[in-house]
Amino acid sequence: MAITKEAIVKAALDILNREGIANLTMRTLAKELNIKAASLYLHIKNKQDLYNLIAEHITQEISLPEKVDDPKEALTFIAMEFRRALLKTRDSTEIFARSVPITLNRTKIIKFALNALSRYGVSDKNCVTAGNLLNNYVLSFVADEIRTRHTSPEEAKQLEQLWGEQYVLNMDFEEQFLYGLKVLLAGLQQIK
Protein backbone atom coordinates (compact mmCIF):
# COMPACT_ATOMS: atom_id res chain seq x y z
CA MET A 1 0.00 0.00 0.00
CA ALA A 2 1.32 3.44 -0.95
CA ILE A 3 1.65 5.75 2.00
CA THR A 4 -0.32 8.92 1.43
CA LYS A 5 -1.87 11.45 3.77
CA GLU A 6 -5.25 9.86 3.01
CA ALA A 7 -3.94 6.39 3.98
CA ILE A 8 -2.46 7.84 7.17
CA VAL A 9 -5.76 9.50 8.11
CA LYS A 10 -7.70 6.32 7.37
CA ALA A 11 -5.34 4.26 9.55
CA ALA A 12 -5.52 6.88 12.32
CA LEU A 13 -9.33 6.79 12.20
CA ASP A 14 -9.25 2.98 12.38
CA ILE A 15 -7.10 3.19 15.53
CA LEU A 16 -9.29 5.94 17.03
CA ASN A 17 -12.52 4.03 16.47
CA ARG A 18 -11.06 0.75 17.69
CA GLU A 19 -8.84 1.83 20.60
CA GLY A 20 -9.41 5.53 21.31
CA ILE A 21 -7.16 8.57 21.30
CA ALA A 22 -4.97 7.29 24.14
CA ASN A 23 -3.67 4.60 21.79
CA LEU A 24 -3.20 6.86 18.78
CA THR A 25 0.56 7.27 18.82
CA MET A 26 3.00 7.62 15.95
CA ARG A 27 4.27 4.14 16.82
CA THR A 28 0.81 2.50 16.71
CA LEU A 29 -0.01 4.41 13.53
CA ALA A 30 3.21 3.23 11.87
CA LYS A 31 2.46 -0.34 12.97
CA GLU A 32 -1.06 -0.07 11.51
CA LEU A 33 0.48 1.02 8.20
CA ASN A 34 3.29 -1.60 8.37
CA ILE A 35 6.01 1.04 8.20
CA LYS A 36 8.60 2.50 10.57
CA ALA A 37 7.50 5.51 12.63
CA ALA A 38 10.22 7.67 11.04
CA SER A 39 8.58 7.12 7.63
CA LEU A 40 5.44 8.91 8.84
CA TYR A 41 7.38 12.16 9.10
CA LEU A 42 7.87 12.18 5.34
CA HIS A 43 4.10 12.80 5.08
CA ILE A 44 3.11 14.59 8.29
CA LYS A 45 5.15 17.00 10.40
CA ASN A 46 4.08 15.87 13.85
CA LYS A 47 1.13 14.73 15.94
CA GLN A 48 -0.43 18.21 15.75
CA ASP A 49 -0.45 17.90 11.96
CA LEU A 50 -2.10 14.48 12.31
CA TYR A 51 -4.84 15.91 14.55
CA ASN A 52 -5.43 18.71 12.04
CA LEU A 53 -5.75 16.19 9.20
CA ILE A 54 -8.19 14.03 11.17
CA ALA A 55 -10.31 17.07 12.12
CA GLU A 56 -10.32 18.16 8.48
CA HIS A 57 -11.48 14.68 7.45
CA ILE A 58 -14.30 14.77 10.00
CA THR A 59 -15.47 18.19 8.79
CA GLN A 60 -15.58 16.93 5.21
CA GLU A 61 -18.74 15.13 6.34
CA ILE A 62 -20.39 18.55 6.62
CA SER A 63 -21.84 19.84 3.38
CA LEU A 64 -22.68 23.51 3.51
CA PRO A 65 -25.88 24.64 1.82
CA GLU A 66 -25.65 26.99 -1.16
CA LYS A 67 -27.66 29.68 0.57
CA VAL A 68 -29.78 29.91 3.68
CA ASP A 69 -31.63 33.20 4.00
CA ASP A 70 -32.57 32.81 7.67
CA PRO A 71 -29.38 33.13 9.78
CA LYS A 72 -30.94 31.26 12.73
CA GLU A 73 -31.72 28.37 10.38
CA ALA A 74 -28.13 28.50 9.07
CA LEU A 75 -26.69 28.39 12.60
CA THR A 76 -28.98 25.53 13.59
CA PHE A 77 -28.03 23.65 10.42
CA ILE A 78 -24.29 24.02 10.96
CA ALA A 79 -24.53 23.03 14.64
CA MET A 80 -26.62 19.94 13.81
CA GLU A 81 -24.26 18.92 11.00
CA PHE A 82 -21.20 19.39 13.21
CA ARG A 83 -22.78 17.25 15.94
CA ARG A 84 -23.69 14.55 13.42
CA ALA A 85 -20.14 14.47 12.00
CA LEU A 86 -18.56 14.34 15.47
CA LEU A 87 -20.72 11.42 16.57
CA LYS A 88 -19.33 9.25 13.76
CA THR A 89 -15.78 9.11 15.17
CA ARG A 90 -14.71 8.01 18.62
CA ASP A 91 -12.91 10.72 20.61
CA SER A 92 -13.63 13.27 17.89
CA THR A 93 -14.20 16.01 20.46
CA GLU A 94 -10.69 15.44 21.81
CA ILE A 95 -9.28 15.60 18.29
CA PHE A 96 -10.95 19.00 17.82
CA ALA A 97 -9.70 20.20 21.20
CA ARG A 98 -6.15 19.32 20.13
CA SER A 99 -6.30 20.63 16.57
CA VAL A 100 -6.03 24.10 15.07
CA PRO A 101 -8.84 25.28 12.74
CA ILE A 102 -6.58 26.28 9.84
CA THR A 103 -7.48 23.68 7.23
CA LEU A 104 -9.49 24.42 4.10
CA ASN A 105 -12.83 22.85 4.99
CA ARG A 106 -12.77 24.01 8.61
CA THR A 107 -12.07 27.55 7.41
CA LYS A 108 -15.07 27.39 5.04
CA ILE A 109 -17.31 26.20 7.87
CA ILE A 110 -16.04 28.91 10.22
CA LYS A 111 -16.63 31.61 7.59
CA PHE A 112 -20.15 30.25 7.00
CA ALA A 113 -20.88 30.40 10.75
CA LEU A 114 -19.35 33.88 11.16
CA ASN A 115 -21.42 35.18 8.25
CA ALA A 116 -24.59 33.68 9.75
CA LEU A 117 -23.78 35.15 13.18
CA SER A 118 -23.25 38.58 11.63
CA ARG A 119 -26.57 38.34 9.77
CA TYR A 120 -28.19 37.16 13.03
CA GLY A 121 -27.29 40.52 14.53
CA VAL A 122 -24.11 39.70 16.44
CA SER A 123 -21.68 42.61 16.15
CA ASP A 124 -18.57 41.99 14.06
CA LYS A 125 -16.57 42.65 17.23
CA ASN A 126 -18.29 39.69 18.95
CA CYS A 127 -18.73 37.25 16.03
CA VAL A 128 -15.57 35.25 16.73
CA THR A 129 -16.44 35.00 20.43
CA ALA A 130 -20.00 33.93 19.55
CA GLY A 131 -18.58 31.41 17.06
CA ASN A 132 -16.32 29.98 19.77
CA LEU A 133 -19.32 29.78 22.10
CA LEU A 134 -21.30 27.85 19.48
CA ASN A 135 -18.34 25.57 18.71
CA ASN A 136 -17.72 24.88 22.41
CA TYR A 137 -21.41 24.14 22.96
CA VAL A 138 -21.40 21.50 20.21
CA LEU A 139 -18.11 19.94 21.35
CA SER A 140 -19.07 19.76 25.03
CA PHE A 141 -22.58 18.54 24.27
CA VAL A 142 -21.26 15.71 22.08
CA ALA A 143 -18.67 14.72 24.71
CA ASP A 144 -21.43 14.61 27.34
CA GLU A 145 -23.81 12.81 24.97
CA ILE A 146 -21.28 10.05 24.33
CA ARG A 147 -20.63 9.67 28.06
CA THR A 148 -24.36 9.69 28.91
CA ARG A 149 -25.22 7.10 26.23
CA HIS A 150 -23.38 4.59 28.38
CA THR A 151 -25.60 5.33 31.40
CA SER A 152 -27.56 2.23 32.34
CA PRO A 153 -31.29 2.51 33.16
CA GLU A 154 -30.39 1.73 36.78
CA GLU A 155 -27.85 4.57 36.89
CA ALA A 156 -30.36 6.95 35.28
CA LYS A 157 -32.93 6.05 37.93
CA GLN A 158 -30.34 6.56 40.68
CA LEU A 159 -29.46 10.01 39.28
CA GLU A 160 -33.12 10.98 39.12
CA GLN A 161 -33.55 9.94 42.76
CA LEU A 162 -30.53 12.02 43.78
CA TRP A 163 -31.75 15.08 41.86
CA GLY A 164 -35.40 14.67 42.76
CA GLU A 165 -37.83 12.53 40.80
CA GLN A 166 -39.43 15.56 39.13
CA TYR A 167 -36.13 16.05 37.21
CA VAL A 168 -36.03 13.39 34.52
CA LEU A 169 -32.82 12.42 32.74
CA ASN A 170 -33.85 13.07 29.13
CA MET A 171 -32.19 10.50 26.89
CA ASP A 172 -33.47 12.14 23.68
CA PHE A 173 -30.17 13.75 22.80
CA GLU A 174 -31.39 15.56 19.72
CA GLU A 175 -34.16 17.18 21.75
CA GLN A 176 -31.64 18.17 24.43
CA PHE A 177 -29.23 19.52 21.83
CA LEU A 178 -31.87 21.62 20.09
CA TYR A 179 -33.10 23.01 23.42
CA GLY A 180 -29.58 24.08 24.41
CA LEU A 181 -28.97 25.54 20.96
CA LYS A 182 -32.23 27.48 21.17
CA VAL A 183 -31.16 28.90 24.56
CA LEU A 184 -27.74 29.84 23.18
CA LEU A 185 -29.19 31.53 20.08
CA ALA A 186 -31.80 33.38 22.15
CA GLY A 187 -28.99 34.70 24.34
CA LEU A 188 -27.02 35.85 21.30
CA GLN A 189 -30.13 37.63 20.05
CA GLN A 190 -30.37 39.53 23.34
CA ILE A 191 -26.70 40.38 23.81
CA LYS A 192 -25.17 41.26 20.49
Which functions belong to the PLM regions below?
Residues 64-98, 102-108, 131-134:
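Hydrophobic alpha-helical connector segments
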Residues 25, 94-96, 150-151:
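Short, hydrophobic secondary-structure boundary micro-motifs
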Residues 107-155, 188-191:
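Hydrophobic alpha-helical bundle segments that form small-molecule/ligand-binding pockets
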Residues 119, 147-192:
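C-terminal peripheral helix-coil segments that are non-catalytic and often amphipathic
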